[in-house]
Amino acid sequence: MAKLACLFPGQGSQSVGMGLDLQQNYSEAAETFAAIDKAAGRSLSSLCFEGPEAELKRTINTQPTILAASLAAYAAYQKAGGPRPDYVAGHSLGEITALTVASVLTIDDAVKLVEKRAALMESCPKGAMTAVLGMAPEVLEELCAQVSADDEKKCVVVANFNTRDQLVVSGDVDAVAKAGALVKEKGGKAIPLPVGGAFHSPLMSSAAAEFAQTLAGCPFQDAQFPVVQNVDALPSQAAEELKSKLSKQMESPVRWTAIVEYLAAQGVDTVVEIGPGKVLTGLVKKIDRNIKFFNVFDSESLKATLAALNAVTV
């Protein structure tokens, strides 16, 4: 039987104006933005709607605003009659959005966790990240291991397995630069990313430990539907298992390819990306062309998605 998954974006999907159309056209979206502003003690909605872009790009602002825009979009999707997902998943930050829509976290707790996560990631030790195209994951992993072995004080790892040939490495500035040079020597493309931290790498270990302490005091509930998590690309519904895996996420790779492959293996043939941008549906298309994909980021895309989903289920 065909199944549906809802996917939630992470950092990099933000844009000035995100969520504004839904806020203006769906009272549930407006109420969600208001609740998030109250929980944050600041106007995240104004940052979403008006920017400025330079402020929106700061990790401390990017992460909570993407959470806000995504949760508001899901509220509108629910109100408009969007079908209940069989699975949910989120890319990095998006996993916290997924946990919230699955009723694992309250909006208040989700906002507090994301604000803490963003602050820790923005203040983490200086590092670098580089996108790598045209190289098999196992080849890149071996290359990173070789670079790291050359200097025990430097490390570089594969941080994002976005598709089979779209990867991201993360680590010490020098080690990432060396890995990028070797990628080019071997015929691949290496594109430095405009970030100042080594996200999803061992350099995040101290931040991850502090985040785990915050998580320990945060109440989790069992999920209403399975959440396929980043660290192992497997589903969880038990509260403590969800919390344990989330605590490891900040210093572990995002296994997005494996998540999509798992969903397909479980019979998921349709995904809806809910929140700003179309990054995740673009990745899904490259991983499995048999999966139908839709987006919800404004009222027009919501109506088009629901019309298409209703046509599929009739």
Q: Predicted segment positions?
A:
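Non-catalytic peripheral regions of patatin-like phospholipases
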Residues: 70, 212-218, 237-254, 271, ...
